[in-house]
From Swiss-Prot:
The gene is CEFEF. Fe cation binds at H184, D186, H244. The keyword Metal-binding applies. DAOCS catalyzes the step from penicillin N to deacetoxy-cephalosporin C, which is used as a substrate by DACS to form deacetylcephalosporin C. Residues 155-268 form the Fe2OG dioxygenase domain. Belongs to the iron/ascorbate-dependent oxidoreductase family. It catalyses: penicillin N + 2-oxoglutarate + O2 = deacetoxycephalosporin C + succinate + CO2 + H2O; deacetoxycephalosporin C + 2-oxoglutarate + O2 = deacetylcephalosporin C + succinate + CO2. Pfam families: 2OG-FeII_Oxy, DIOX_N. This is Cephalosporin biosynthesis expandase/hydroxylase. Keywords: Antibiotic biosynthesis, Iron, Metal-binding, Multifunctional enzyme, Oxidoreductase, Vitamin C. The lineage of its organism: Eukaryota, Fungi, Dikarya, Ascomycota, Pezizomycotina. It comes from Hapsidospora chrysogena.
């Protein structure tokens, strides 16, 4: 583990025992490891194995049934290389070399009842931990939240995604394309990330800390916490939203480089509003031509091209699904 990233126990965050240390971490780095979160390895393992089994063994018909044609939706299944963080952030044209499943509060698409039972329980447990972390982060910097109570603020519109990063092919090794997923900050208040380690020891996840990207290895019993752009906006610029990325392995580490990450974005309510010019001054790419905008509008403009274009035949095979509730807008 890099010495630049602190580690906190959830109980210590909730009790205020490490209030000063937490405030320093979120205002200067925007990242820390979280231990004793209330979730145990079995919680993560069950959700991960259920999802990866579907990725590997689900039929094409089953996958089409939980794939939305709506380019803006973040629900259900996204096939390998269907998304591109690099295109959205204007840092490249390469795809995210991963397969993904997403769910939220409502409008979900589950492959079967067993999958739904496992994932609904996992979602609820991650949501509880994320709210506890967000309360601690916001309290540590004395966030005013424009008069809104913190408990009300964290009852919001979260998103849970599991990404499976398979071993990369020869044309996606680091010598050909350095990244599996482009550098980005999260559109969330905070984000919880539970990652599995690559079997060959390669560390794929990195975060920008003190001006350089540092490795974020898997720690037993720990999750990574990223502070997101909404955390910055909600605290008047106090909380830092760091950029992070996923590296590609070199040719000598290609075999054994598969990994997963369960990512829980604590996103605000869709009508969360903020000052556009101020957000730009804090480094966020908000191009909406108005003085103020909402989280819903920001997502709609910023992530419309998250899903990469596919051949017409492939797109035609994806049926249009029922519209997702407006309480569940586009994903990070």
């Amino acid at each position: 583990m890099t010495s630049k990233v602190p580690v906190f126990r959830l109980d210590d965050l909730k009790s205020g025992k490490v209030l000063t240390e937490l405030a320093e971490a979120v205002t200067t780095k925007g990242i820390f490891y979280l231990t004793e979160s209330g979730l145990v390895d079995d919680d993560h393992t069950s959700a991960r194995e259920t999802c990866v089994d579907f990725f590997k063994n689900g039929s094409e018909e089953e996958k089409r049934a939980v794939t939305l044609a709506d380019r803006n939706a973040r629900r259900g299944f996204s096939a390998l290389e269907w998304e591109s963080t690099a295109v959205v952030t204007e840092t490249g044209k390469y795809s995210d070399y991963s397969t993904c499943y997403s769910m939220g509060i409502g409008g979900n698409l589950f492959p079967n009842r067993g999958f739904e039972d496992v994932w609904q329980d996992y979602f609820d447990r991650m949501y509880g931990a994320a709210k506890d972390v967000a309360r601690a982060v916001l309290n540590s910097v004395g966030a005013p939240l424009a008069g809104e109570d913190i408990d009300d603020f964290v009852e919001c519109d979260p998103l849970l995604r599991l990404r499976y990063f398979p071993e990369v092919p020869e044309d996606r090794v680091a010598e050909e394309e350095p990244l599996r997923m482009g550098p980005h900050y999260d559109l969330s208040t905070i984000t919880l990330v539970h990652q599995t380690a690559c079997a060959n020891g390669f560390v794929s996840l990195q975060c920008e800390v003190d001006g350089e990207f540092v490795d974020l290895p898997t720690l037993p019993g720990a999750m990574v916490v990223f502070c997101g752009a909404v955390g910055t906006l909600a605290t008047g610029g106090k909380v830092k939203a760091p950029k992070h990325r996923v590296k590609s392995p070199g040719r000598d580490q290609r075999v054994g480089s598969s990994r997963t990450s369960s990512v829980f974005f604590l996103r605000p309510k869709p009508d969360f509003s903020f000052n556009v010019q101020q957000s730009r001054e804090w480094g966020f790419n908000v191009r909406i031509p108005s003085e103020r905008t909402t989280f819903r509008e920001w997502l709609g403009g910023n992530y419309v091209n998250m899903r990469r274009d596919k051949p017409a035949a492939a797109e035609a095979a994806v049926p249009a699904a029922a519209p997702v509730s407006t309480a569940a807008p586009i994903a990070t």
